[in-house]
Amino acid sequence: MRMGFYYSLEDWRFPHQLPHLPMWEDKSVYQPMVEQAHAQVRELMTNYGKVDILWYDGSFPSGIWRSEELNAMVRSLQPEIIINDRSGLPEDFGTPEQHISPQDRPWEACMTMNDTWGYTAGDKNYKSVRQILGMLIQCASQGGNLLLNVGPDAEGRIPEPAVERLRVVGEWMRTNGKAIYGATRTPLVTHSFASSTRVGDRMYLLSAHWPGSTASFGWCGNRVLSAKLLATGERLIVEQKGDRVWLRGMPQYAPDPNVSVIEITVEGEPKWPEVRFT
């Protein structure tokens, strides 16, 4: 198992770090917190074996934290590490928060299960299973990762509404994980029928709005060899004519109440221009 650290550059034990106070105008005021950050990050990079990810949190400019110096030290101690973009420098991957915004480099969307990051007893606005799967699929289909936050209560317990939803998502992943793990984006544009991901010579159509017994999509690339329901292995009839592929013999009703997945195998590595479902 790979190991990483979350590290908050800001430390709330320093009362002068609160953003409504003008601490950043006087270097002598915030310097103790910066020195602490450098010392603690060095300790994390030195005392715990191989570290794969350093996930900073914080929102102030890189000059405040002396981030170039800090990250150079990190990479000297952990040459294979990857670092996120929250020290004020782009580094290795982006971390859009509370929105899913694809980037032209590795990225992961940081999303909450309800409306808060920590535990808030009064926050009952939990996302549904369908919403969570939708976020997961949106990230995977656009080449990103989903970082889903769960806030434990004061006793360290995961709130039951989160547990209930995560169990259902976990069951879905056990059945359909092939469409998510290691997936990359495809040129197929999301529409009302399905989103799509690609793994090797297989493409996956992930449908939250099942079209019934027949569906089609535009395709100008490799020959389509086969199609099946991922959950059951049931084969579908494939008809490829010109720039369209028709899928027939599908169940009239969605096999999964949340998101159903079709696995499509093509001849060789998928290569095609960008197309759009119609």
Where are these regions (language model features)?
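Mature catalytic domains of secreted/periplasmic carbohydrate-active enzymes
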Residues: M1-T278
